[in-house]
Structure formats: structure tokens, C-alpha cells
Amino acid sequence: MSSGLAGSTRADLESIRAVAGDALAFTAGLDEGGVAALPQADRRTFRALKNALAEIGELVSRLPPDLRARYPEVDWRGWAGLRDVDSFGRFGPELPRLHPAMAEELPVLVAAVTAELARAGAERGNGPAQPQSPDR
């Protein structure tokens, strides 16, 4: 590929974007208190959110350093660290940071991922996907 974006990296970026959308949907309409109450109030949503964030952490940890360097506004290390927090079951101390991460930091991550996917598409000369005609 002329863009230098390997297929696995592209897949990881697309997965980050999809899983981030899920995580945002899980917390839609919740304020800081609502997010902090999730472990007791809605364990299913809390576990789904935890799993989504751990998945994002794993995916972020696999991204190449040069890609991460292009987006210094993203706390790549912090996102990658979420996989470790979840894998060791120590998510409790992170609860106070959860709402700010979801409200402020996740949109920054998604914007960087979206920009990188667009950049790779532009380098390949493939702008955004075009709709297929019905007669194909």
C-alpha cells in the first residue's frame, strides 16, 4: 500500500472507531454521577463499558509509534493503559476519571483515528467510499 497503513493497522483503527461508538452509546445521557454509579446501578452496562475500554486499550497498544506521533493531542499511553487496568481487575480507582475520559478524551481519540483513516485513504487516492449504483 502506498499509504504505509498496513491492513492490520487499518482494521485496528476501524475497530477503535466502532468500539468507541459503542462506549459512547453505553454512557449516553449519563452525567459524572451516573457514570460513577454504573458499577452498582447497572452492572451489565458497566461491564460492557469496561470491556469496550479494555478493547480500545488493546487496539491502541498495537498502533505503530509513527502513527501515534502524528496525533500528540491523544493520550495514547493512557488509552493503552486501560487494557492493563481491566485485565488486572483494578478498574475501581479509575472511576473518577471515567466520565472525563468518556466526555473529553474519547472524542479526541475518535477524531485522530478518523483523521488517520481519511489520510490513508487520500494517500491511496481513495477518498471516502462512493455509493454503488443499483445496477451493479
Language model features: what each stretch is:
Residues 1-136:
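Solvent-exposed interaction patches of small proteins and small membrane subunits
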